[in-house]
């Protein structure tokens, strides 16, 4: 009897509510302090367990499947190798999040793959063990595996659960691809923001140390942020290109979205301190 498809595994986007760069480490990575919060806008994945070890990926987004270095496939392969599981999976990705915009979609897809297949393959790794696999694939992946809003330090892997307010956001995705590597290699990037205690950081105005540099180099980001600042406190997430404005009411965010210039793409989403992936785990 063929295996059933396990459907509707969410891979939520994240926002960096602040992002501070505290210096460059000896290994070349940057020391960061950042605050992650999920939003209720997600990619969706379906999985079918197979008896043979092949890993097959389908997607509604052209170009995703052709990439053999795809994080979804690398995550599944890493779980196979770590556990010795000799079966495989067929995976369907419904890509809804903008790619390469600082929303963490690729990392979230990989995290959902690890969490879902760990359950469906009955490999029984702990959350910490899954996070260790994820960290080898990308610094953002552990926060999606743990599934709670978090203050992060190091390269982003040391996590402390936090409970910020859950406002509504208007997220704009400018028509620009910002290379994270280029941003972190740029000599003009500020790298000397002092490390502060979490209580201090949570109580002061929030900022993104990458924003000034990216805005200066990408006019599309500058234009989107300038427009959004007329309606709400706004800043960039990650290394961009996406920017977000914060609203207390959904209706306020929707009213601003209705005025969005036709050349810009945007959506309204609510902040979530608990990932919908954790909720999905409790279902068959």
UniProtKB/Swiss-Prot annotation:
Active site residues of this protein: 14, 140
Residues that bind ATP: 98-108
Coiled-coil residue windows: none
EC number: 2.7.1.148
The keyword Heme appears for this protein: no
Superkingdom of the source species: Bacteria
Catalytic reaction annotation: 4-CDP-2-C-methyl-D-erythritol + ATP = 4-CDP-2-C-methyl-D-erythritol 2-phosphate + ADP + H(+)
Pathway(s) it belongs to: Isoprenoid biosynthesis; isopentenyl diphosphate biosynthesis via DXP pathway; isopentenyl diphosphate from 1-deoxy-D-xylulose 5-phosphate: step 3/6
SUPFAM superfamilies (UniProt xref): GHMP Kinase, C-terminal domain, Ribosomal protein S5 domain 2-like
PANTHER family the record matches: 4-DIPHOSPHOCYTIDYL-2-C-METHYL-D-ERYTHRITOL KINASE, CHLOROPLASTIC
Purpose: Catalyzes the phosphorylation of the position 2 hydroxy group of 4-diphosphocytidyl-2C-methyl-D-erythritol.
Record protein name field: 4-diphosphocytidyl-2-C-methyl-D-erythritol kinase
Species per Swiss-Prot/TrEMBL record: Shewanella baltica (strain OS155 / ATCC BAA-1091)
